[in-house]
Design a protein with these regions (language model features):
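P-loop (Walker A) phosphate-binding loop of NTP-binding proteins
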Residues: 18-19
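ATP-dependent NMP and nucleoside kinases share a basic, alpha-helical "lid"
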Residues: 8, 37, 100-152
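ATP-binding Walker
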Residues: 22
Length: 231
């Protein structure tokens, strides 16, 4: 039995995609009460950064990721994106982090996982291959700031290594990891529109997982949208 067959048969995975500050980590924490263990592609990257740069938990996991470190002269978010994309994805292979994540899930005794940082099309494809439900979190107030970059991508014919290098020069806002899924079709799960309070958003994430649990991971709300506030 291949690792993909084993994961599809023995593990239950939901995965959150969306832009930075859309609420992916919050959603992962919200569904932990259903037995889903939060896990991220970036977990090994954060361990590297804390070992090499001695960043604090708040700098790597908390609200200070985008703040420039006074000693190093760059932000933890920037160096994590550089290590994850420019160093590993672009030189070792685009599947390096998704294979790492699937290997960690496969070797774990836990059977339910919530992936909190899906950012690239190949990650969506690999996760769907093992039966994961992909949940797209949209936060309308942060979407418009990336529109100019989407137009530039269209002219270049998509995300290329050259484009990724250009994005790195623009900074974290325009990094390839923030825009690669903009036009990628997500064929499972649902959209959660995060346009209300934090409590409303957490409840929306829980309600979706309740439906997944009730229908034994069926695509009950496939193609629909769940709003975190009353429209």
């Amino acid at each position: 039995m291949s690792i993909y067959e084993r994961l599809r048969k023995e593990k239950k995975i939901i995965a959150f995609c969306g832009k930075k500050r859309s609420g992916k980590d919050t959603a992962g924490d919200a569904v932990a009460s259903f037995g889903y263990m939060p896990i991220a592609f970036a977990d090994p990257i954060k361990e590297i950064c804390q070992t090499v740069f001695e960043f604090s938990d708040e700098q790597v996991y908390g609200s200070r990721k985008s703040e420039v470190d006074e000693f190093w002269g760059f932000s933890p978010r920037w160096v994590m994106q550089t290590i994850g994309t420019e160093m590993f994805r672009n030189h070792i292979g685009e599947d390096v982090w998704v294979k790492s994540l699937l290997s960690r899930i496969n070797s774990s005794n836990h059977d339910k996982f919530a992936v909190t940082d899906v950012r690239f099309p190949n990650e969506v494809d690999r996760l769907q291959r093992v039966g994961a439900e992909i949940i797209h979190i949209r936060r309308p107030e942060i979407e418009p700031e990336l529109n100019p970059v989407k137009k530039w991508i269209a002219k270049q014919g998509g995300i290329t290594k050259q484009a990724a290098k250009v994005f790195a020069d623009f900074g974290p806002k325009y990094h390839a990891s923030e825009i690669s899924l903009d036009d990628h079709p997500v064929t499972s799960g649902a959209d959660i529109v995060n346009n209300g309070s934090i409590d409303q958003f957490r409840q929306a994430a829980r309600e979706y997982v309740m439906e997944v649990e009730k229908e034994d991971n069926s695509a009950l709300v496939n193609g629909g949208q769940i709003f975190a506030s009353h429209m």
